[in-house]
Amino acid sequence: MSEQESRDNAAVDAVRQKYGFGFSWLVLMIALPPLVYYLWICVTYYQGELVFTSDAAAWRRFWSHVAPPTWHAAGLYAAWFLGQAALQVWAPGPTVQGMKLPDGSRLDYRMNGIFSFLFTLAVVFGLVTMGWLDATVLYDQLGPLLTVVNIFTFVFAGFLYFWGLNGKQWERPTGRPFYDYFMGTALNPRIGSLDLKLFCEARPGMIFWLLMNLSMAAKQYELHGTVTVPMLLVVGFQSFYLIDYFIHEEAVLTTWDIKHEKFGWMLCWGDLVWLPFTYTLQAQYLVHHTHDLPVWGIIAIVALNLAGYAIFRGANIQKHHFRRDPNRIVWGKPAKYIKTKQGSLLLTSGWWGIARHMNYFGDLMIALSWCLPAAFGSPIPYFHIVYFTILLLHREKRDDAMCLAKYGEDWLQYRKKVPWRIVPKIY
């Protein structure tokens, strides 16, 4: 390992200590599963109203809606998870190398997400068309599925914990069993060529998210004889986002989660439970709320989504092209940048000269456009934008600390050159 790589790894460790979870990991592991149930129950049984009461009997009635697991739901999810794993391993797609690991090695990854995504949609469409699968099954089984997937992730995280106990030197657990269960004990656990972390990061959670949305739309049609414009907007926006994700799937290999986080309960539960069951809250709400939107409102929401996407994808593409060719023209002019003592180049042109994370700003615009079609009858469809804002604010601070530890004075110079963090002129 080079001296520079050693410094980079030390910077990662320092940032992880400062921006990790401290003792809050236990609170998260205890509180988050009930929170997802709470949101689902409020949407499904209380018309989207947030339920707060001091009456013990009312709380018992509320929590009595928690659905027990069923063999139907368990069978559905087992078939789903194993089927997606098979596609990850055997579906056609290019093989690329990941980022350097702490020991200097690189792993191979098969990037076949877009094939798996489209193949899955084709199979599900065929099964529904032939009458072998009910289009509303995921909505009808949503409660039991939530319980099944929760149970599965807790068990799976236990498997991952024991899997990594004999890992490489730089993967050693902390010696605190419950914390290691939460954070993980292995960086890249694999079964043969199946990289469990990369697989769970996208396939069983993100594609499931889309199928759940489609099931919500089918349920709305079954109940009301129509699929409303708000439902079409939500499903359309999120489908486009997922297609874009899988087209650019290789970019996930450069993310913090893949490069630095071990694979434990936190990522496992977040990928398999949090993502599909909370990112579908807008569609869940719209199943029983069939309001219309004015034409100007539809135009404004579509414009917000497209503008957010243009900023999000445009910023990411600019940085990707700059890394490949620093002499590339950005917005009609030669790229401007700061060269660090380590030799890295910090782009200060284009979107990256407006704010340090304009891609986050675009992502937040997209997230808000997913919520607005639900109108303002309930705060629950807006849970996503609140959570996502908190997430990106934390991530920006973590990234800033990481770059300061890595680049020192050069990063301070970059801060002066580009003072705004996410939102130009505001933050």
Swiss-Prot record:
Task: Please tell me which top-level EC class this enzyme sits in.
Answer: oxidoreductase
Q: Which residues bind NADP(+)?
A: K319, R323, L347, W352, N359, Y360, D399, C403, L404, A405, K406, Y407, Y414
Q: Keyword annotations for this protein?
A: Cell inner membrane, Cell membrane, Lipid biosynthesis, Lipid metabolism, Membrane, NADP, Nucleotide-binding, Oxidoreductase, Steroid biosynthesis, Steroid metabolism, Sterol biosynthesis, Sterol metabolism, Transmembrane, Transmembrane helix
Known consequence of changing Y360A? Loss of catalytic activity
UniProt GO cellular component terms = plasma membrane
Please provide the Gene Ontology terms (biological process) for this protein: ergosterol biosynthetic process; sterol biosynthetic process
Annotated Gene3D superfamilies: 1.20.120.1630
Q: Where in the cell is it found?
A: Cell inner membrane
Named from the GO MF annotations, one term is: Delta14-sterol reductase activity
Variant or mutagenesis effect after changing W352A = Loss of catalytic activity
- State the reactions this protein catalyses: 4,4-dimethyl-5alpha-cholesta-8,24-dien-3beta-ol + NADP(+) = 4,4-dimethyl-5alpha-cholesta-8,14,24-trien-3beta-ol + NADPH + H(+)
Q: Which residues form the signal peptide?
A: none
List residues in topological domain: Cytoplasmic. Answer: 1-25, 92-110, 163-197, 248-262, 313-356, 400-427
Changing Y241F has the effect of: Loss of catalytic activity
Q: Which residues lie on this side of the membrane: Periplasmic?
A: 47-70, 132-141, 219-226, 284-291, 378
State the EC number(s): 1.3.1.70
Family stated for the protein in its record: Belongs to the ERG4/ERG24 family.
What does the UniProt function comment say about this protein? Reduces the C14=C15 double bond of 4,4-dimethyl-cholesta-8,14,24-trienol to produce 4,4-dimethyl-cholesta-8,24-dienol. Complements the deletion of the Delta(14)-sterol reductase gene ERG24 in yeast.
Protein name in UniProt:
Delta(14)-sterol reductase
Organism field: Methylotuvimicrobium alcaliphilum (strain DSM 19304 / NCIMB 14124 / VKM B-2133 / 20Z)
